[in-house]
Amino acid sequence: MRSLRLLFPALLFVIPSAAAAQGATAAPDERAAVLAVVQRLWDAMKARDTAMARSVFDSSAMLSRAVTRNGEARVQLTPVSAFLEALSHATEPWNERMFSPEVRIDGSLATVWTEYDFHLGDKFSHCGVDAFQLLKTSAGWKIVALSDTARREGCQKQR
């Protein structure tokens, strides 16, 4: 009985941490499904295919960019509709590539954090970090938010 009293408090610490670790670890097939959505967006951008691009976003999705102007950090919000409109007028393919993506999944919520570089056609434009939030819906994984940074310096993987 005494050993049970000692074991119970220990289990209170072990069980929640094991469950948390398991929840954040993505099963290989779910990880692949989440990354496929991101890649589908980039394939759509390269092809300038607005229908394909629209298909990866949830209807409530929003895009945001962290920018610094006059030494002050701000968030620049862009509706998906404005992004799609710009894509429809692109004269060159938008070529974005990811490097070393980190995927976290807990139930129906997934996050992808990845470095990227961006080219207009074959010409380097900028690099940064993309942070995707995805929701698993009845239609599959959908992007509900995409935040990024963009810079021209310190881009080690731009070729």
Mark where each language-model region is.
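N-terminal signal peptide c-region/cleavage motif recognized by signal peptidases
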Residues: V14-A18
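Short, solvent-exposed secondary-structure junction/capping segments
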Residues: Q39-D43, F57-N70
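Short beta-strand edge/turn micro-motifs at domain boundaries
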Residues: T111, H126-G154
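A mature extracytoplasmic/lumenal domain signature
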Residues: F57-S59, V67, T114-F118, S147-D148
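Surface-exposed, charged secondary-structure patches
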Residues: Q22, M62, R74-F124
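Hydrophobic pocket/interface hotspot
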Residues: L41, A53, A61, V112, ...
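Short, low-complexity N-terminal intrinsically disordered segments enriched in polar/charged residues
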Residues: A19-V56, L77-T78, Q158-R159
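Bacterial N-terminal signal peptides that target proteins for export
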Residues: M1-F8
